[in-house]
Curated annotation (Swiss-Prot):
Taxonomic path: Bacteria, Pseudomonadati, Pseudomonadota, Gammaproteobacteria, Enterobacterales
Family annotation (InterPro entries): Biofilm_formation_YgiB (IPR009576)
Protein name: UPF0441 protein YE3666
Species of the source: Yersinia enterocolitica serotype O:8 / biotype 1B (strain NCTC 13174 / 8081)
Region (Disordered): 101-125, 190-229
Compositionally skewed regions (Low complexity) per UniProt: 109-120, 214-229
One Pfam family it belongs to: DUF1190
HAMAP family: UPF0441 (MF_01188)
Family: Belongs to the UPF0441 family.
Parts forming coiled coils: none
Length: 229
């Protein structure tokens, strides 16, 4: 009888160990799944211009120039556009604006959005846009994809002293020569802007994007703490 009890107890202990190991195995699987998701992020470097990039990558000057020129072209297409220089300067500051270059199909159209104004067709170069303040470049071995970055010197702008993209997404301090990790979606082409935006409209976009980024970061930290017990 005693021997039977010992056998039953041993069987129970093995079953209990298996039960306790199951959550551990699930947790390990979750970690590997998260690691797989992180591969969707991309490491990028921030530069002011092609010379800045070439100085940091002497053997890649051609790639630096190509990426810079690509970013300039993207900036011309995707930067916020303003009907007057004054509207642009109000958001980005003095010496931060330029006339938008002539572009195929760039004819302002009416929009129901509160951030845009219905503009009559204008002649080439009559709209204003912020100057490209820098650009974000992906790993050169991956083709050197790039995205233009803008910054504001207007004291009241949410983009003051920050690098933001054409959608208003914030990439931190407007300091070049640094490297950071961003979602791959940050390097995706942005839609061309064919409407003029009202004064303060882009600043609102930056504020909204920053709020969303803070909420996402808070949610991520909360989830991490929950997984950690």
């Amino acid at each position: 009888m005693k021997r039977t009890q010992n056998i039953n107890q041993e069987t129970f202990r093995k079953s209990w160990r298996s039960y306790r190991l199951a959550p551990v195995a699930l947790a390990i699987s979750a970690v590997f799944m998260l690691a797989g998701c992180e591969k969707t992020d991309e490491t990028v470097s921030l530069y002011q211009n092609a010379d800045d990039c070439s100085a940091a990558n002497p053997s890649k000057s051609a790639e630096c120039t190509t990426a810079y020129n690509t970013a300039l072209q993207e900036a011309a297409k995707t930067a916020p556009k303003y009907a007057t220089r004054e509207d642009c300067v109000a958001e980005f500051g003095e010496s931060q604006c330029t006339q938008a270059p002539a572009q195929a199909g760039m004819v302002p159209t009416s929009s129901s959005s509160s951030e845009t104004t219905a503009a009559a067709p204008q002649q080439s170069g009559s709209m204003w846009m912020p100057l490209m303040a820098g650009y974000m470049m992906g790993r050169m071995m991956g083709g050197g994809a790039s995205q233009p970055l803008f910054t504001s010197k207007a004291p009241n702008s949410p983009a003051n002293g920050k690098f933001v993209d054409a959608t208003g997404k914030n990439f931190g301090s407007a300091t070049t020569g640094r490297t950071m990790t961003v979602p791959r979606t940050a390097m995706a082409p942005k839609p061309a802007v064919t409407n003029t935006i009202t004064r303060g409209g882009f600043g609102e976009s930056v504020a909204k994007q920053s709020s969303m980024q803070r909420s996402a970061a808070t949610s991520s930290k909360t989830s991490t703490r929950s997984m950690g017990g």
